[in-house]
C-alpha cells in the first residue's frame, strides 16, 4: 500500500513523543491521546493532568507550541535536524511548535487540553 503523506505521519509521531514526555515531566499521571485522520491532515487531541507547581512549565509549552510566526523554511530546517542531538528539551518543543500547522492549548487548574494539527 502506497503511503501518500509519510512526512505528515512522521511529524505527528514526533509530536506525540515530545508531548507525552513533556506532560509526564510536568507530573502527569494520565495522558489521553486521540489521533484523527482528516482530509487536510492529522489532528491530535490531548488531555492530561499536571501538578500545579508545574503550571509555569506548561505555560511555556503553550507558547512554544503556538509561535507567533511559523516559518516554513525554519520548520523544514528543524525537521532535517530532528534526528540530530539538539541542545535540550526546549529545543525539541520549539521544533514541535514549528512543525505544527495549528495548535491550541488550554490550561485548567490541574488539567491541560491540546488540539494539535499537522497538514498533509
Segments and roles (model prediction):
Residues 1-3:
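Helix-loop-beta hinge of the Bergerat
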Residues 6-37, 89, 93-99:
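Conserved ATP-binding N-box helix of the HATPase_c
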Residues 37-39, 107:
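Generic beta-strand structural signal
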Residues 40-44, 112:
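Short beta-strand element(s) in the Bergerat
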Residues 43-93, 117:
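Glycine-rich/acidic phosphate-handling loop/turn and adjacent ATP-lid/helix
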Residues 101-106:
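Glycine-rich ATP-binding loops of the HATPase_c
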Residues 110-120:
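Short C-terminal beta-strand
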Amino acid at each position: 500500500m502506497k503511503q501518500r503523506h509519510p512526512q505528515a505521519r512522521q511529524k505527528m509521531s514526533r509530536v506525540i513523543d515530545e508531548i507525552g514526555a513533556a506532560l509526564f515531566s510536568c507530573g502527569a499521571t494520565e495522558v489521553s491521546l486521540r489521533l484523527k485522520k482528516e482530509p487536510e491532515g492529522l489532528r491530535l487531541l490531548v488531555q492530561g493532568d499536571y501538578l500545579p507547581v508545574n503550571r509555569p512549565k506548561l505555560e511555556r509549552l503553550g507558547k512554544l507550541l503556538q509561535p507567533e510566526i511559523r516559518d516554513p523554511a525554519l520548520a523544514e530546517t528543524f525537521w532535517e535536524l530532528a534526528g540530530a542531538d539538539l541542545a535540550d528539551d526546549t529545543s525539541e518543543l520549539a521544533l514541535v511548535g514549528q512543525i505544527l500547522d495549528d495548535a491550541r492549548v488550554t490550561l485548567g487548574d490541574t488539567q491541560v487540553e491540546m488540539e494539535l494539527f499537522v497538514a498533509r
